Amino acid sequence: MSSSSPNPFRRSLKFVEQWYRETPQRALDGAYEAARAIEEIEKKHFKGQPVPLRIRTESVMTNYFQSEVQKNLQFIQTRLREFKSSSLVVEVADKLKPPSIPPAPTPLDTPNTIDFTDEYDVTSEEYSSELVSPSIDAQGSLDKLAFIDAVLKRYRSASIQREAAAAASKAARASAPKSGSEMKKNIPQPLPIQSAQNSLYESEFISDDITEDPSKLDSSSFIPRSILRTATRFRKELNPDPGTEDDILNDFRNSRVRTRAAVSFVLGLMIVPLLTQQVSKNLVIGPFVDKLKGPEQIEIRINPEIENEVLTELARFEERLKFESLTSPIPLSPAEIQFQLKAKAEDLKEEYQWDLRQPLKNAISDLFSLVALAIYFVLNRQKIAVLKSFFDEIIYGLSDSAKAFIIILFTDVFVGFHSPHGWEVIVESVLSHFGLPQDRNFINMFIATFPVMLDTVFKYWIFRYLNQISPSAVATYRNMNE
């Protein structure tokens, strides 16, 4: 019976291998069916045009089709990733597969032996031929990929989506009632960036740029930006096109959505690392580190200040006992003094055990918070661009005096005359957080070099960028600094 035991296991392995080899075609078929579903929605309900994902109306049908298209787009991307990864694994496995070795002949004259090998065993050539389905052809796969790419292209292109949104907006205005409240109700509204009630996947297909020219904020111009913005505002206000009001409303809604997205992203930057650090430290890392034996001894050797603190307090307690023994009418015996010193030493050990293990907990929990912050950045990549544009709008919207005031405030705080005291507190806090010794030479060297380098970076930024973007702000900064 021992010879038959490997055969079911081998058959299970072959079944799993065959199933995984069919994964690329299965994933491609799933993506193809989702793309066909999107095309059916376009043909039946949008006259063959792409579904406008950049607008939101009060129409329940339109919102339903938008959510269906977004769901299918997300499903297509998931299946395409599965198709690429599984195809790569199958290709690498085929290249690394060793040549087949024919099995050794089984003696037929052995008594009381049942031969199960012919029932399940197949050669590698027969197995490979079984895995390759005759219905799967390369040309069919290429046709499906081309069809999927054509569908995705209609939703990756921002220009196509703008045309679809404009067409939907015109259709809504043409069919809207004449009353002002109902017209305002039927005006298509822009979808919020990664809003909670809509699919987060929309941002991967639509280039929802803040401006038509991303480099406009970073380039210098002979004409001041305030004059250009005022001229653009007058041009929009004097434009007789009835669609201008819709554009202004859409711009306002987009600006409001960007502000909310930027504020939520900044709050997430503060809350996610802090919450991860505290939760992991108190619920995961803390109980694990408390069970370890001897980390406090390692910490004492690394940080002699902790050892000195313990010994100083114990010596102070011993001196207090001797003083009380000398001033008391009934002096303490040496045995009683030794007993109280031993009890105090045990209390100090229990008291400082928590502090001695804190640096290890802090280091591991900080690593967890960094990982959580990296994941947060990866999941909110589009909001980084939104945050940059939000800060650009705020900074460029300030007056020259306000810009100069902010620059002077930051430079005086970080690289000013009194900044070494603040840097000393920061460095000592960081060293204490990780349980490192507070070496005065290292602290003085850091304070003598890092603020100088930071001051150089500030001056280079003012000379290289701010002088081109806002020369008047630089002039105001120099006058205020003098």
UniProtKB/Swiss-Prot annotation:
UniProt entry keywords in alphabetical sequence: Cell inner membrane, Cell membrane, Hydrogen ion transport, Ion transport, Membrane, Transmembrane, Transmembrane helix, Transport
Family statement: Belongs to the CemA family.
Lineage top rank: taxon: Bacteria
Cellular localization per UniProt: Cell inner membrane
Ranges that cross the membrane: 265-285, 359-379, 406-426, 442-462
Pfam families xrefs: CemA
PANTHER family (alphabetical): CHLOROPLAST ENVELOPE MEMBRANE PROTEIN (PTHR33650:SF2), CHLOROPLAST ENVELOPE MEMBRANE PROTEIN-RELATED (PTHR33650)
Annotated InterPro entries: CemA
Name of this chain's protein: Proton extrusion protein PxcA
An example molecular function term from Gene Ontology annotations: proton transmembrane transporter activity
Role according to the record: Required for H(+) efflux immediately after light irradiation to form a rapid H(+) concentration gradient across the thylakoid membranes. Together with PxcL, contributes to transient H(+) uptake following dark to light transition.
Main location: membrane
GO cellular component, one term: plasma membrane
Topology term for the membrane: Multi-pass membrane protein
